């Protein structure tokens, strides 16, 4: 059976925590930031866990993590 390939696009966007959860960065933090408040920018900088509905799809694309 051939080796499973890791999706590099997904590997760059998601990390696995020590407890096994998938972590992601929040969106809307790349440009058009001057209209956003400091509080909003600060909260967008934090990481959050992936929704339960998406975990199966991400795990299939990252077979060795």
From Swiss-Prot:
Basic residues biased stretches: 25-44
GO molecular-function terms, A-Z: structural constituent of ribosome
Where can this protein be found? Plastid, Chloroplast
* Keyword tags: Chloroplast, Plastid, Ribonucleoprotein, Ribosomal protein
Superkingdom, taxonomy of origin:
Eukaryota
- In terms of one coarse class, where is the protein primarily found? plastid
Gene Ontology biological process terms, A to Z: translation
Q: Which GO terms describe its cellular component?
A: chloroplast; large ribosomal subunit
Q: Is Repeat among this UniProt entry's keywords?
A: no
Say yes or no: keyword Transport present: no
The family note in this entry says: Belongs to the bacterial ribosomal protein bL35 family.
This one is known as: Large ribosomal subunit protein bL35c
Q: Which organism is it from?
A: Pyropia yezoensis (Susabi-nori)
The upper taxonomy is:
Eukaryota, Rhodophyta, Bangiophyceae, Bangiales, Bangiaceae
Q: Which gene encodes it?
A: rpl35
């Amino acid at each position: 059976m051939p080796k499973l390939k890791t999706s590099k696009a997904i590997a760059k966007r998601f990390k696995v925590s020590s407890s096994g959860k998938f972590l992601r960065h929040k969106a809307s933090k790349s440009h058009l930031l001057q209209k956003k408040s400091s509080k909003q920018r600060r909260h967008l900088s934090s990481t959050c866990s992936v929704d339960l509905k998406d975990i199966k799809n991400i795990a299939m694309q990252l077979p060795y993590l």
